[in-house]
Amino acid sequence: MEMGNQHPSISRLQEIQKEVKSIEQQVLGFSGLSDDKNYKKLERILTKQLFEIDSVDTEGKGDIQQARKRAAQETERLLKELEQNANHPHRLEIQNIFQEAQALVKEKVVPFYNGGNCVTDEFEEGIQDVILRLTHVKTGGKVSLRKARYHTLTKICAVQEIIENCMKKQPSLPLSEDAHPSVAKINSVMCEVNKTRGTLIALLMGVNNKETCRHLSCVLSGLMADLDALDVCGHTEIRNYRKEVVEDINQLLRYLDLEEEADTTHAFDLGQNHSILKIEKVLKRMREIKTELLQAQNPPELYLSAKTELQGLIGQLDEVSLEKNPCIREARRRAVIEVQTLITYIDLKEALEKRKLLACEEHPSHKAVWDVLGNLSEIQGEVLSFDGNRTDKNYIRLEELLTKQLLALDAVDPQGEEKCKAARKQAVKLAQNILSYLDLKSDEWEY
């Protein structure tokens, strides 16, 4: 049917579908909760479109009925997606962790800016724990979860940075007001900036409902204007003092932009991040080396060159910029473990090869430890090849094998032999490291 002769009901349905399509990306990328203003707005729009679709007269015609059904299904799909985004278990996990950070800020930081004692080590440890747990929240590559995790981390890391900067680099102590008429004003502005710092932290963490980003931005801009208006020509010390306070204000204004950037930035998509791409490049080469080693007819020929290249890969990972992003830091940490585990695997293989060449007598307990190390080497090869999750039968089997080796080591009696004690301790550590590596490989973490 040509457009000019199209039934009015079909045309109306197409208009509604176009309107629904126009907000699809907003729905798919929605990273908030069900009590957010934007959630209610999107829900209202979609519900209204459903009513509009329902009110289209089909006149009993099959083609119009089918078109109406398709339009309703598409709108219902987006409504369901919106609801799932807001109530996803991992989204709620992010919110619960954020609420812990809010409680920490309320208890430890806000009183500090209201004239209390200094920020405690307990707060710093608590925030570090929160950041670490957030980096471990699984997103499954889902845009809404990635955004939620990124925005939450960004705010908490900003608060951590504001406090660290404040503790590390206090501006010059207020100069004597006798030095110049402008000093009194700069001192006054500096006091206001310190108060505003506390307000900004409370605002970023959502523990101050009386303040808005816009108003705080106006306050800071006003303080900046006051400083700009001061005549400090020919007074280097006073000019430098003013410059420090101006830099502080600019830094706080940058933090204020975080909320606005949250909805426009694609920084949450770490798949395109330069540092992550470097890490991925290293991991790709590491996997190639691993495959060559595990499939080689004569692996010992490759040990030296493989170890040399792997150590070079560790060097490349050390050079990766973390960009103050805990997710990049975690990605690098895991990559280092991946490469280091392969180096350890080669080290053990080499040690076992050398032992074969030694035909000397040894203490029975020492031999028992070496037997376990031989078993661990075989199991480690399987763990390196493992590519599943914790529900896989193979995961459970490998975990049981490693536990058996730990029990075997526990049963070894060194009989006072110091060399045997040290060897057993080293073997236990290796078995535990392989277990930890198996856990790391199977925890389904992603950027």
UniProtKB/Swiss-Prot annotation:
Record's GO cellular component terms: cytoplasm; cytosol; inclusion body; junctional membrane complex; membrane; mitochondrion; nucleus; perinuclear region of cytoplasm
PROSITE patterns, A to Z: BAG (PS51035)
- Looking at the record's lineage, which domain of life comes first? Eukaryota
An example GO biological process term is:
regulation of inclusion body assembly
Q: List all disulphide bridges recorded for this chain.
A: none
Q: How does it assemble?
A: Binds to the ATPase domain of HSP/HSP70 chaperones. Binds PRKN. Interacts complex with HSPA8 and JPH2.
Please identify the protein, giving its name as recorded: BAG family molecular chaperone regulator 5
Q: Which gene encodes it?
A: BAG5
